[in-house]
Amino acid sequence: MMKLYGVRTSPYVRHARVALAESGLSWQFEQVTPDTINLSPTLRVSFLIDGNLTLTDSAVIVRYAREQSGQAFLPSVGDHELFALATSILDTTVNLYLLNIGDSAALAEVATGTSAIGFNPRTYYERQQERIVAGVRGLDQFELDASAPFTDGHIRLACLLDWASYRETIDLLGLNKLNDFLTRMREWPTFAETAPDL
């Protein structure tokens, strides 16, 4: 039986959980522990073990679940672009969240001096914030039909938005398309059952 290792609050793990739930395959979820994290060569979640096969990236896990169950994974360029943009923003948002654990004021106070190699932490932080804002505006331009069957682009976007709402990392005020999309996705039982606060 396949085992997916992760934490319930991870948006990457959530996408894998949704794909596996839709697959009809036999699998189980294991909350990662300090001991089990060592089963992954990257020492991060999500990872899946199926016999001798270990997959260490959520996109690969989702693809594997889709292929094993005869379902499509990113069937169009448009869906792949939605998936990629949502993943890029998600990566940036998670990175900033982990850097300051939700305390943007503390990181904003980082000294503005640069390191010996020219790295300026404050400039880095500000640039990442700009990427998030621009990326979310870009996502709000997509035509988002939130009706089943959902694509992996839709699911990745919903995982991003719901995690950002849960962690209060992205302001969706005035982004009506994204808000409406997330509201509809939260009504889908497979997505609702994997909410980060459950």
Per-region residue spans from a language model:
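GST-like domain detector, emphasizing the conserved glutathione-binding G-site
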Residues: 1-123
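Short, contiguous strand/loop micro-motifs
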Residues: 3-4, 169, 193
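Short polybasic/polar patches that bind polyanions
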Residues: 21, 166, 187
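Non-transmembrane alpha-helical segments in soluble domains
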Residues: 62, 66, 80-83, 136, ...
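Short, hydrophobic secondary-structure boundary micro-motifs
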Residues: 73-76, 105-106, 148, 173, ...
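GST-like fold's C-terminal all-alpha helical module
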Residues: 90-180
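Long hydrophobic alpha-helical segments typical of transmembrane helices together
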Residues: 176-198
